[in-house]
Regions:
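N-terminal ligand-binding lobe of clamshell/alpha-beta domains
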Residues: 1-128
């Protein structure tokens, strides 16, 4: 897979364990393929009954600008989803250096949002 920044992201497919560092993407995952979500930020407040929807505990990994990288690594995610604007490049780099696959979205327009999410869900989660 190639993320929105053109970086190759190697993952086992279909992805089974995801940490989302982007509140809007957390909501999209929870509503589309909830079983894969194992971690998200403290700012991921929608859907309001997240754990009820996904059917298991979703570990909170602090904020979008200060994620707990150790907690993320300990969750053994197949994929971490981040956003170029929302998350720090430093955290993405350190997660990748630790062997964690990170997909970074870059969304400036509605069209880019639709395209990015479509690719992520089709290529990463096997959702068609």
């Amino acid at each position: 897979m190639i993320d929105d920044l053109g970086v190759k992201v190697s993952v086992a497919r279909p992805v089974q364990r995801v940490v989302s560092l982007v509140p809007s993407i957390t909501e999209a995952i929870a509503m589309t393929c909830p079983h894969v979500l194992v971690g998200c930020t403290d700012y991921c407040i929608r859907p309001t009954h997240l754990e009820e929807i996904v059917g298991h505990e979703v570990v909170r990994v602090r904020g979008t600008k200060n994620p707990d990288r150790k907690a993320i690594i300990d969750l053994r995610p197949d994929l971490v989803v981040a956003n170029q604007e929302e998350n720090r490049e430093h955290d993405v780099t350190l997660l990748r250096e630790a062997g964690v696959a990170v997909w970074v979205t870059r969304i400036d327009t509605v069209e880019e949002a639709i395209s990015s999410l479509t690719r992520l869900f089709e290529e990463g989660f096997g959702v068609r």
